[in-house]
């Protein structure tokens, strides 16, 4: 190899190549990989949606659709950053403004240092051209192409963290409710019915529910708040709480039917709440912009912000425990002697602003702040390393990470399940969930009717069928009787039941 060939060969080693200088096999391999991964992810999401639709998980299906919308917004932002990074880099601003409100002051370089770096690095000519365009005017670029690329990475990390945090919310919440299933099954046993005989008189203070929430050192409101604050960390929903709240809900909304599956209703209610917390509102995006604006060196905004989600989650958990405790106090004040199970009163006045959904809105905002906090920590560690100015104080970073994980666990495993059951003590209830259970009963009955009609082949059976139809005309159908006994909405007839009655008359 001649000296000239060696010189050309050495100049090609490590050189930055455009696509027209890239081997086609390399280009095709990279394209195939990203296309395959994208198609697999799209198929998995569609498969999940189909599965949820087949199992009639309406709330979770809507949550998946909302999550897809969030990912679409994040994808559009990343795409716009990549497409417009060249034009944005051409925007020049005075240097005096560029040196204000910096997140890391020690990384600022002088013009001479930058020029020397540019001379040593011939691979960044495209980015350097924008720098020289601005420097020739005595200005600097608003944000470099490298900065825009790093920002697009942040949106990618935020999307991944948003998915992981919401998945943790759903899985931990359902794990918390799994043990409630055994309590629900216990309500159908003879022992439970005997222990909660409606004809049995008991002193209110001697009931298990009252003994759990009432004591000598909870007579003042402050003492009760302190007790409820610590209670959320251990046994936040006791068995007696579940059974008492179940009895109050059934008495208020489902007549006196003890066969109602309250645990299944609460689980579907959690799915409804999950559908709410999975989204990202414009106010939340505005919060992201504000925190990026205030991320100035020495202000430690993110450190102080990391305590906000923890405080809010603890306050909401304490408030929910207080609602249950005040129900026990109300029962004691109204009745010294009760019959059967203590009856809690369903009323929106238990909640702030008489609005149970207000707590969920605050919790939704808090969960997003926590997700943003974890995404930011992962992003700065990935992009700038552990030796960057963001990690000057390792203790602060560790504290922020521990607080974020703690908030995620508390809100997912304790606060949201507690909210799902306590908010059923409001004046209203999620009628759509009850209607969905009712619809399942109707579908089961309709399937039985179709199977029975297929077996009718003789005139005798046809006559019997006509006689049965006559019975239906003169009264209620079997499904109407079953549904009416299963779901009696405090004397109000279900719209689905009314629709089925009209449909049956039309078919006949």
From Swiss-Prot:
Pfam families: Mlo. The modification Phosphoserine is found at residue 494. The keyword NAD does not apply. Residues 453-492 are annotated as: Disordered. The keyword Membrane applies. Residues 43-68, 175-275, 326-357, 423-508 are cytoplasmic. It comes from the Eukaryota. Keywords: Calmodulin-binding, Membrane, Pathogenesis-related protein, Phosphoprotein, Plant defense, Transmembrane, Transmembrane helix. One of its GO terms (biological process) is defense response. It is found in: Membrane. The chain crosses the membrane at residues 22-42, 69-89, 154-174, 276-296, 305-325, 358-378, 402-422. Residues 1-21, 90-153, 297-304, 379-401 are extracellular. It is a multi-pass membrane protein. GO terms for molecular function: calmodulin binding. One of its GO terms (cellular component) is membrane. Residues 436-457 are annotated as: Calmodulin-binding. The C-terminus contains a calmodulin-binding domain, which binds calmodulin in a calcium-dependent fashion. May be involved in modulation of pathogen defense and leaf cell death. Activity seems to be regulated by Ca(2+)-dependent calmodulin binding and seems not to require heterotrimeric G proteins. Belongs to the MLO family. This is MLO-like protein 3.
């Amino acid at each position: 190899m001649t000296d000239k060939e060696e010189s050309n060969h050495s100049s090609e080693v490590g050189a930055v190549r455009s696509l027209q200088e890239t081997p086609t096999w390399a280009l095709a391999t990279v394209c195939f990989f990203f296309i395959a991964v994208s198609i697999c992810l799209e198929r998995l999401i569609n498969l999940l949606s189909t599965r949820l639709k087949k199992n009639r998980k309406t709330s979770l299906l809507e949550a998946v659709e909302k999550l897809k919308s969030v990912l679409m917004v994040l994808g559009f932002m990343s795409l716009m950053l990549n497409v417009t990074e060249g034009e944005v880099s051409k925007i020049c601003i005075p240097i005096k403004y560029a040196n204000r409100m910096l997140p890391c002051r020690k990384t600022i370089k002088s013009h001479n240092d930058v020029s020397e770096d540019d001379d040593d690095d011939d691979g960044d000519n495209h980015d350097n051209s924008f720098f020289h365009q601005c420097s020739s005017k005595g200005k600097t670029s608003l944000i470099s192409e490298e900065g825009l690329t790093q920002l697009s990475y942040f949106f990618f990390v935020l999307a991944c963290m948003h998915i992981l945090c919401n998945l943790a919310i759903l899985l931990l919440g359902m794990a918390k409710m799994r043990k409630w299933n055994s309590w629900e099954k216990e309500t159908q046993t003879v022992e439970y019915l005997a222990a909660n005989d409606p004809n049995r008189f008991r002193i209110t203070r001697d009931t298990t529910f009252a003994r759990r929430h009432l004591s000598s050192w909870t007579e003042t409101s402050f003492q009760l708040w302190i007790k409820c604050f610590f209670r959320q960390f251990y046994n936040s929903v006791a068995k007696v709480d579940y059974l008492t709240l179940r009895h109050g809900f059934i008495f208020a909304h489902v007549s006196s039917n003890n066969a109602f599956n309250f645990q299944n209703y609460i689980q579907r209610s959690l799915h409804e709440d999950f559908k709410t917390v999975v989204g990202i509102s414009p106010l939340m995006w505005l919060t992201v912009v504000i925190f990026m604006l205030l991320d100035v060196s020495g202000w430690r905004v993110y450190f102080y912000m990391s305590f906000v989600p923890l405080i809010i989650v603890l306050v909401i958990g304490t408030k929910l425990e207080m609602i249950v405790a005040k129900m026990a106090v109300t029962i004691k004040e109204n009745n010294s002697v009760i019959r059967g199970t203590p009856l809690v009163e369903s009323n929106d006045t238990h909640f702030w602003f008489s609005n149970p959904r207000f707590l969920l809105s605050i919790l939704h905002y808090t969960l997003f702040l926590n997700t943003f906090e974890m995404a930011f920590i992962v992003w700065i560690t990935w992009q700038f390393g552990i030796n960057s100015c963001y990690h000057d104080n390792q203790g602060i970073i560790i504290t922020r990470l521990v607080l974020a994980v703690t908030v995620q666990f508390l809100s997912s495993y304790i606060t949201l399940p507690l909210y799902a059951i306590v908010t059923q003590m409001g004046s209203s209830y999620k009628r759509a969930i009850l209607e969905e259970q009712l619809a399942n009963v109707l579908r089961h009955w309709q399937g039985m009717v179709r199977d029975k009609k297929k077996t009718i082949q003789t005139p005798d059976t046809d006559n019997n069928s006509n006689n049965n139809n006559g019975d239906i005309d003169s009264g209620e159908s079997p499904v109407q009787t079953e549904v009416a006994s299963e779901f009696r909405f405090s004397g109000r007839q279900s719209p689905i039941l009314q629709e089925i009655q009209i449909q049956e008359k039309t078919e006949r």
